[in-house]
Amino acid sequence: MRTVGVFLATCLVTIFVLPTWGNWAYPCCHVTQLRAQHLLALENISDIYLVSNQTCDGFSLASLNSPKNGSNQLVISRCANGLNVVSFFISILKRSSSALTGHLRELLTTLETLYGSFSVEDLFGANLNRYAWHRGG
């Protein structure tokens, strides 16, 4: 039964994560600590692409994108700690779990699976300087 659960979880993660690779030529990015004026407002974020920690040397990353006002053209993209982004959405979805639609319950399960796939062991072989936190403008 556990094998079937792992298989289904892998399929769901594949459905949600793999399509982002076609939209993102290089999924591994540097997480940068930004000044307040450069942060994306939550209501302006149009897309969030999660990257599996297996893709970027043990690092779980996310791309937060925002279009130009009144346009479909992507103009702002920020790299974030994917584990923090996943944790944030898990927390939000769990707070209203009794009112979730089927799609949101499926998303919650997928996010929990993605979160559960992260382990400290992944970092043992990682090049910790490659995607290090940088102070940005």
From Swiss-Prot:
The heterodimer glycoprotein H-glycoprotein L is required for the fusion of viral and plasma membranes leading to virus entry into the host cell. Acts as a functional inhibitor of gH and maintains gH in an inhibited form. Upon binding to host integrins, gL dissociates from gH leading to activation of the viral fusion glycoproteins gB and gH. The heterodimer gH/gL targets also host EPHA2 to promote viral entry. InterPro entries: Herpes_gL_rhadinovirus, Herpes_gL_rhadinovirus_sf, HSV_GL_alphagamma. It comes from the Viruses. Disulfide bonds join 28-56, 29-79. GO terms for biological process: fusion of virus membrane with host plasma membrane; symbiont entry into host cell. It comes from Epstein-Barr virus (strain AG876). Its main location: virion. Gene3D superfamilies: Viral glycoprotein L. This is Envelope glycoprotein L. Belongs to the herpesviridae glycoprotein L family. It is a peripheral membrane protein.
